[in-house]
Amino acid sequence: MQNTFQQISLYGRLLGACFYYEPSDSRIAGVLDFFRQPNWMQEWEIPLEEKTSEKLTALIKQGLKQDLTEEYQNLFIGPNELKAPPWGSVYLDPECVIFGHSLLALRDFLKRHQIAFQSQQDEPEDHIGLMLMLAAYLAENRPHLLVEFLSQHLLTWAPHFLTKLANVENYQFYQGLAQLTLIVLDDWKHKLNLSVPKVHFYR
């Protein structure tokens, strides 16, 4: 179990940073350097099928040749309509808005467990990158909360979002990242024997 927590800590931070920080941010430089290694998949601790491994390696390699800053802007900031918004309540709230009911439930979780959350001013905490990094924090400091957080707050919507992102064409790095994250989350789900409630997606 301790090894599972260590993997959640490692991959929660690594993948969360890729979704949360702009590619030009110095805090993600080391992560991008990791993916630039020709043999990074050999260091990946969660086993993948050979065809899947080859596909993801090729996607990410090709994607790293593109302008990631522009792609990040188009996918996660705008100004055009976002094809796969990175906030949970956009999918879980009937109004398809940020700051929806699922975010309030997440905030209640944070408040009940006295988890101080530092994000950008007025930013919803249910951003995929923030929530992956929060999973890492919990694995490191309060692992007894992981089951509730993952099953009730992250895994309810993240696979749906990641599937949508993986299908957005011509953004190879983020397509590969989404597919890799799907595999990682499924691994966490099975290793922790999580039961995730079925929800209705409004988008």
What are these regions (language model features)?
Residues 1-203:
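Charged, alpha-helix-forming regions
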